[in-house]
Design a protein with these regions (language model features):
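Cationic-aromatic interfacial patches
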Residues: 3, 17-99
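Surface-exposed, glycine-biased beta-strand/turn segments
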Residues: 84-192, 228, 282-314
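Sec-dependent signal peptide recognition
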Residues: 2-10
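Conserved, short, structured surface segments that act as functional micro-motifs
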Residues: 224-295
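Zn2+-dependent peptidoglycan hydrolase active-site motif and core
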Residues: 176-219, 243-251
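Structural recognition of the beta-strand scaffold that forms the well-ordered cores
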Residues: 164-166, 173-175, 195-197, 204-208, ...
Length: 314
């Protein structure tokens, strides 16, 4: 075990960025349980003098464990940070790795927890907590497994850089986080797809294999600003074709991917940073956006505003 840990640290040393250079590699290996516990501490202490940020907790646990972040290490990190000590000091000799993990996890998770408001019973209700949503709308079933890195062969041999969520044809798909629609249309691999960049520019969310003939939410266009939980499209099985609007995927599903962007040169290149989102999808499954179909189309049951990016609605 000690030898394995030493090897992990040695590998990390090779990719730790000189501060003038952007991070070029992230192995996101944090369990749902670890994220949930750290998030609970963040929410619990949000209004206390000593606020425990969940990213600080996870980054401290990660630099102590070579990025593995077991729940026991996360609990210890949270307890240690309750005192008057910085994360770097709490990590001791391993504190030199803290900055890397903090930046990496901030890019992966930075937009997930914060202040938001929902419109309920005739008024806007401010809240603090998980402000992002499962990509699958409330009331619709799905299944998935950790398939990140599984081989793919259409076009060329490559690794699967996302998580496939199997569900029913036409299942409403929503934006996990708010941002700007950066890509939209046909792709020979992903079929009908939407790409949304987070407001801070660090996260690029990719939603692919949308429904033939009716892939996108009405009126959605490139350049639009979308809210977390906003309807963006419908589940299908389009793709694997140079010709548009073709179903060559055998099973109806959503391909959901997350790319981290520390520098614009990384956005489209041979060394893009896509992370395993399986555990993240599990975390988000408890927070789903509700829609109802009316004569006017699909309508959100509880309108939403991200208060970290917009003012409190009048």
């Amino acid at each position: 075990m000690k030898r394995l840990f030493a090897c992990l640290l040695a590998c990390l040393a090779l990719v730790l960025p000189v501060r003038a250079e952007p991070i070029r590699w992230v192995d996101f290996d944090v369990s749902t349980e670890s994220m949930a516990y750290a998030m609970q501490q963040d929410i619990r202490t949000a209004e206390q003098e000593k606020h425990l940020g969940w990213i600080e907790i996870l980054a401290l646990a990660a630099c102590r464990t070579g990025g593995k972040c077991p729940l026991s290490a996360v609990k210890k990190a949270a307890k240690d940070l309750e005192g008057d000590v910085s994360p770097e000091e709490a990590a001791g000799e391993l504190g030199k790795y803290y900055a890397y993990y903090y930046e990496a996890y901030s890019a992966a998770l930075g937009g997930l927890v914060g202040s938001y408001a929902i419109f309920k019973d005739g008024q806007w209700v401010p809240q603090y907590g998980l402000k992002t949503f499962s990509p699958i709308a409330a009331g619709y079933g799905y299944s998935h497994c950790d398939d990140f890195g599984v081989g793919r062969s259409f076009g060329f041999k490559r690794k699967h850089l996302g998580n496939d969520l199997m569900g029913g044809l036409g299942t409403p798909i929503v934006a996990v986080e708010g941002g700007i629609v950066e890509a939209m249309g046909w792709n020979r691999y992903g079929g009908w797809r939407v790409g949304i960049r987070s407001f801070d520019g660090k996260r690029y969310y990719y939603y692919a294999h949308l429904q033939k003939d009716r892939p996108f939410a009405s009126g959605l266009e490139i350049g639009d600003q979308v809210d977390a939980g906003q309807l963006i499209g419908f589940m299908g099985r389009s793709g694997y074709s140079d010709k548009e609007n073709v179903n060559n995927i055998e099973v109806v599903h959503l391909h959901f991917g997350l790319e981290l962007v520390f520098d614009e040169s990384q956005k489209e290149c041979n060394s893009e940073i896509w992370i395993d989102v399986y555990q993240l999808v599990r975390l988000l499954s408890a927070h789903r956006s509700s829609y109802q179909k009316t004569d006017r189309g699909w309508e959100r049951v509880y309108p939403y505003k991200d208060l970290d990016w917009t003012e409190f609605p009048a």
